[in-house]
């Protein structure tokens, strides 16, 4: 009966596996619970779920992933647009710090610019220094030469006028031309009546070893009111000339001119014995000697006095 029930219950397994397999499965107690057919197996709930619901679940998962990707992409685009309109978290801290430090940074930038400008102004380049020095060296001799040439020209004109005794428009025109060419500073101020002893036109003669003698003779001639002018200053000019002769290394030009004039005045034609025997001329003929002394003194004054001072006097 028991065997009959087995055959009725498992007819398919007997036909497939044979009698030996049925016998072996009967000997195993767990065969009734786990199922006798191990090769093909029997339909269970797991197999049914896998066969029916697995494709559905896979489709739902794929759809959810696709939807999540699209939703995340839209969310990222929206957040990027919001970032452009609104600062990110912590940006306000950076902005406040920058606005706090900006005045100090601006002050430092201004100080650096001022310091750089002052350095460039106080320290000119080497080329500029060289150009300034060369311009100064070149301009000084030109001015000195011009003053010397104008003084010599004025002296020559006045000496010629004194020698010839003429006073016409020609000499006035020459004086005007010399005055235009001369740019030397005036030593005598007629408004205040003072003499500038530091004037370059005096050639530094007021400060040399014979400066006191020169000042005495020059001031006497300037303030003289006698006719002819400077008649009372003859002794002072002679003292000045004697001082010049004591220092020939400094006043070589002045001593040379005075010696030439003395030699010219001392040269006189030799007289014959007949002339020596002749009686001397009356005293009235020798009355011209003081005038000759005055002429010589005026020539000496002209040689020592600049043109600008002579014209003002």
UniProtKB/Swiss-Prot annotation:
<dbReference type="GO" id="GO:0160203">
    <property type="term" value="P:mitochondrial disulfide relay system"/>
</dbReference>
<feature type="disulfide bond">
    <location>
        <begin position="210"/>
        <end position="243"/>
    </location>
</feature>
<feature type="transit peptide" description="Mitochondrion">
    <location>
        <begin position="1"/>
        <end position="61"/>
    </location>
</feature>
<keyword id="KW-1133">Transmembrane helix</keyword>
<feature type="domain" description="CHCH">
    <location>
        <begin position="207"/>
        <end position="251"/>
    </location>
</feature>
<keyword id="KW-0472">Membrane</keyword>
<keyword id="KW-0812">Transmembrane</keyword>
<keyword id="KW-0653">Protein transport</keyword>
<feature type="topological domain" description="Mitochondrial intermembrane">
    <location>
        <begin position="74"/>
        <end position="313"/>
    </location>
</feature>
<dbReference type="GO" id="GO:0016972">
    <property type="term" value="F:thiol oxidase activity"/>
</dbReference>
<keyword id="KW-0560">Oxidoreductase</keyword>
<dbReference type="InterPro" id="IPR039289">
    <property type="entry name" value="CHCHD4"/>
</dbReference>
<dbReference type="GO" id="GO:0015035">
    <property type="term" value="F:protein-disulfide reductase activity"/>
</dbReference>
<feature type="disulfide bond" description="Redox-active">
    <location>
        <begin position="199"/>
        <end position="201"/>
    </location>
</feature>
<feature type="compositionally biased region" description="Polar residues">
    <location>
        <begin position="268"/>
        <end position="289"/>
    </location>
</feature>
<keyword id="KW-0809">Transit peptide</keyword>
<dbReference type="InterPro" id="IPR010625">
    <property type="entry name" value="CHCH"/>
</dbReference>
<dbReference type="GO" id="GO:0005739">
    <property type="term" value="C:mitochondrion"/>
</dbReference>
<feature type="transmembrane region" description="Helical; Signal-anchor for type II membrane protein">
    <location>
        <begin position="63"/>
        <end position="73"/>
    </location>
</feature>
<keyword id="KW-0496">Mitochondrion</keyword>
<feature type="short sequence motif" description="Cx9C motif 2">
    <location>
        <begin position="233"/>
        <end position="243"/>
    </location>
</feature>
<feature type="compositionally biased region" description="Basic and acidic residues">
    <location>
        <begin position="140"/>
        <end position="150"/>
    </location>
</feature>
<keyword id="KW-0735">Signal-anchor</keyword>
<keyword id="KW-0999">Mitochondrion inner membrane</keyword>
<feature type="short sequence motif" description="Cx9C motif 1">
    <location>
        <begin position="210"/>
        <end position="220"/>
    </location>
</feature>
<dbReference type="Pfam" id="PF06747">
    <property type="entry name" value="CHCH"/>
</dbReference>
<keyword id="KW-0676">Redox-active center</keyword>
<dbReference type="GO" id="GO:0005758">
    <property type="term" value="C:mitochondrial intermembrane space"/>
</dbReference>
<feature type="region of interest" description="Disordered">
    <location>
        <begin position="255"/>
        <end position="313"/>
    </location>
</feature>
<keyword id="KW-0813">Transport</keyword>
<comment type="subunit">
    <text>Monomer.</text>
</comment>
<feature type="region of interest" description="Disordered">
    <location>
        <begin position="116"/>
        <end position="169"/>
    </location>
</feature>
<keyword id="KW-0811">Translocation</keyword>
<protein>
    <recommendedName>
        <fullName>Mitochondrial intermembrane space import and assembly protein 40</fullName>
    </recommendedName>
</protein>
<keyword id="KW-1015">Disulfide bond</keyword>
<dbReference type="GO" id="GO:0045041">
    <property type="term" value="P:protein import into mitochondrial intermembrane space"/>
</dbReference>
<dbReference type="GO" id="GO:0005743">
    <property type="term" value="C:mitochondrial inner membrane"/>
</dbReference>
<feature type="topological domain" description="Mitochondrial matrix">
    <location>
        <position position="62"/>
    </location>
</feature>
<comment type="function">
    <text>Required for the import and folding of small cysteine-containing proteins (small Tim) in the mitochondrial intermembrane space (IMS). Forms a redox cycle with ERV1 that involves a disulfide relay system. Precursor proteins to be imported into the IMS are translocated in their reduced form into the mitochondria. The oxidized form of MIA40 forms a transient intermolecular disulfide bridge with the reduced precursor protein, resulting in oxidation of the precursor protein that now contains an intramolecular disulfide bond and is able to undergo folding in the IMS.</text>
</comment>
<feature type="disulfide bond">
    <location>
        <begin position="220"/>
        <end position="233"/>
    </location>
</feature>
């Amino acid at each position: 009966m028991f065997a009959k029930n087995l055959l009725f219950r498992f007819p398919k397994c007997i036909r497939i596996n044979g009698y030996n397999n049925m016998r072996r499965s009967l000997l195993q107690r767990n065969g009734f619970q786990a199922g006798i057919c191990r090769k093909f197996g029997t339909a269970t709930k797991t197999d049914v779920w896998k066969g029916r619901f697995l494709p559905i679940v896979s489709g739902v998962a794929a759809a959810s992933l696709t939807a999540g990707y699209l939703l995340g992409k839209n969310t990222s685009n929206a957040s990027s647009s919001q970032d452009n309109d609104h600062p990110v978290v912590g940006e306000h801290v950076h902005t406040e710090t920058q606005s706090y430090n900006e005045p100090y940074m601006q002050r430092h930038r201004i100080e650096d610019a001022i310091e750089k400008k002052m350095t460039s102004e106080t320290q000119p380049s080497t080329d500029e220094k060289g150009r300034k020095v060369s311009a100064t060296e070149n301009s000084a001799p030109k001015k000195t030469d011009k003053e010397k040439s104008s003084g010599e020209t004025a002296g020559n004109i006045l000496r010629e006028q004194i020698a010839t005794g003429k006073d016409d428009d020609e000499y006035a025109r020459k004086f005007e031309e010399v005055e235009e060419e001369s740019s030397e500073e005036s030593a005598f101020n007629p408004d205040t009546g003072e003499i500038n002893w530091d004037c370059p036109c005096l050639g530094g003669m007021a400060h040399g070893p014979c400066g006191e003698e020169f000042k005495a003779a020059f001031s006497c001639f300037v303030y003289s009111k006698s006719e002819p002018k400077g008649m009372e200053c003859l002794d002072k000019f002679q003292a000045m000339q004697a001082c010049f002769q004591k220092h020939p290394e400094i006043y070589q030009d002045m001593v040379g001119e005075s010696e030439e004039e003395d030699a010219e005045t001392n040269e006189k034609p030799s007289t014959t014995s007949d002339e020596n025997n002749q009686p001397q001329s009356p005293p009235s003929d020798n009355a011209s000697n003081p005038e000759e002394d005055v002429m010589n003194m005026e020539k000496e004054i002209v040689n020592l006095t600049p043109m600008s001072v002579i014209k003002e006097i």
